[in-house]
Amino acid sequence: MNAPTERPETSVDPKLLEILVCPLTKGPLEFDSAKQELISRSAKLAYPIRDGIPIMLPEEARKID
């Protein structure tokens, strides 16, 4: 019998990435699978993904360098 292969969400639907933008700059976002975040390079913010749901609130975002 095979062991379960289920694991936490590790990717974002590419179609979702096409339509999501940074709420501050309206620029594109990049998915960081290791940290489960959507990165806005132009705003220097990382938006968390919790339970597979992107949290697109600037006050919830982490500042990045």
Curated annotation (Swiss-Prot):
Where does it sit, as one GO cellular component term?
Answer: cytosol
Gene3D superfamilies named among the record's database cross-references: 2.20.25.10
The family database entries (SUPFAM superfamilies) matched by this protein are listed as:
Trm112p-like
Q: Name one Pfam family in it.
A: Trm112p
Q: What is the top-level taxon of the source organism? A: Bacteria
**Family in the record:** Belongs to the UPF0434 family.
State the protein's name.
Answer: UPF0434 protein bsr0601
